Design a protein with these regions (language model features):
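Enzymes that bind and transform nitrogen-containing heteroaromatic metabolites
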Residues: 1-216
Length: 216
């Protein structure tokens, strides 16, 4: 069975977006995203696709698969494959993952395809255990942004909540998104050029850490 991952960036409050965009500028996160996903199919919703500047889409070195209710069957458009549902996207990702790619696979090549947004696509993918060809999302890569007290960043889109395992390696009760453990976490760093943008337009200092989680 193919292995499916999800990747996103979030504040410590779980914010991943505001007004159809990301309330930050994070060059380190963009570089990490490229490193992780390069060479693998990426699955996204229409709004995520449209949030990329036209000069950056399709994302190079990756099969771009866009989910949109505006199509009833798969069709090629603007350098991407447009499909009507998450299930259709996963079948397309399976087919693409089994074909040679021009780009060099990322260091996390154990993941065959990535979910990259937006909120509703993450929510459906993380909560399901019957995803065609993949079963369920098994890996999450997330960039965690720390907001200094008094500089909290607000937004209208949140990341899926992931329940972390206790010291015994299990989770109490049940969670719709399953039980997870952190397998790697980088030290906190202060971004030299990046910033978190509050609703007033003020640029606030950005501290970030990269985390990898695996489903138990």
């Amino acid at each position: 069975m193919f292995r499916l991952g999800a990747i996103w960036a979030q504040t410590d409050a779980g914010i991943i977006g505001r007004d159809g965009d990301m309330p930050w500028y994070a060059p380190e996160d963009m570089a990490y995203f490229k490193k992780v996903t390069l060479g693998a199919p990426v699955i996204m919703g229409r709004r995520t696709w449209e949030s990329f500047p036209p000069r950056f889409r399709p994302l190079p070195g990756r099969t771009n698969i866009v989910i949109s209710r505006s199509v009833t069957e798969a069709e090629e458009r603007d350098g991407a494959l447009w499909v009507p549902s998450l299930d259709a996207a996963l079948y397309a990702a399976r087919d693409a993952a089994g074909a040679p790619v021009e780009a060099t696979p990322a260091d996390t090549a154990a993941v065959d395809a990535w979910i990259i947004g937006g909120g509703s696509v993450y929510a459906e993918a993380l909560s399901r255990t019957d995803l065609p060809a993949f079963g369920r999302v098994k890996t999450v890569e997330r960039t965690h942004f720390y907001c200094q007290e008094g500089n909290e960043i607000t937004g209208d889109t949140r990341a899926p909540e992931l329940q972390l395992a206790n010291s015994a390696g299990s989770c109490e009760g049940s969670s719709p998104n399953g039980c997870w453990r952190v397998t790697s976490e980088s030290a906190w760093e202060n971004s030299e050029k990046g910033y978190l943008l509050d609703e007033s337009g003020t640029k606030n200092p950005m501290y970030f850490s990269f985390q990898r989680l695996e489903r138990i």
